């Protein structure tokens, strides 16, 4: 009940392990079967669009907020850029998703990665900054 009030734009099977921190909640749009593990942070100053069947590991941080590099502008301005995570993704623990990033469908982001640029569908991306190291086979493992 409280979760639905905090994040009203989430589909069935949306679950968060506490503690969880967000700026607003109403800017988080999630499909069905989305799972946030413990200690996640979502700075949702702009929309955060999460597809269905997405697993987000412990300590993941999703940022839409940014600040100008210029010190004078930084005193008064904050920018926000939307983040999108496609269907069937797994975001590894301690990863950071930066403002304006789109992670395509079927992606795995390795633990501890810092995603600064878009990641294409069906990719395994790891590192700081995250780089695609290979495409993922989308055939279910049970059929191999």
Name the predicted role of every residue range.
Residues 1-2:
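An accessory alpha-helical subdomain
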Residues 6-7:
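N-terminal helix-cap/turn-to-beta initiation motif at the start of protein domains
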Residues 20-30, 35-102, 128-130, 134-144:
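Flexible, glycine/small-residue-enriched loop-and-beta-strand segment within the central core
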Residues 102, 116-117:
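Active-site/ligand-binding-proximal alpha/beta "capping" segment
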Residues 109, 127:
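Conserved G/P- and acidic residue-centered "switch" motifs that form tight phosphate/ATP-binding loops
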């Amino acid at each position: 009940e409280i979760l639905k009030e905090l994040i009203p734009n989430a589909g069935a099977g949306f679950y968060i392990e506490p503690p969880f921190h967000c700026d607003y909640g109403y800017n988080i749009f999630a499909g069905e079967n989305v799972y946030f593990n413990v200690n996640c942070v979502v700075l949702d100053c702009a929309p955060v669009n999460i597809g269905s069947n997405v697993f987000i590991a412990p300590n993941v941080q999703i940022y839409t907020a940014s600040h100008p590099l210029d010190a004078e502008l930084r005193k008064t301005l904050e920018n926000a850029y939307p983040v999108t995570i496609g269907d069937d993704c797994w975001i590894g623990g301690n990863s950071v998703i930066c403002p304006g990033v789109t992670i395509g469908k079927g992606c795995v982001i390795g633990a501890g990665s810092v995603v600064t640029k878009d990641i294409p569908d069906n990719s395994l991306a790891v590192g700081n900054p995250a780089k695609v190291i290979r495409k993922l086979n989308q055939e279910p493992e049970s059929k191999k």
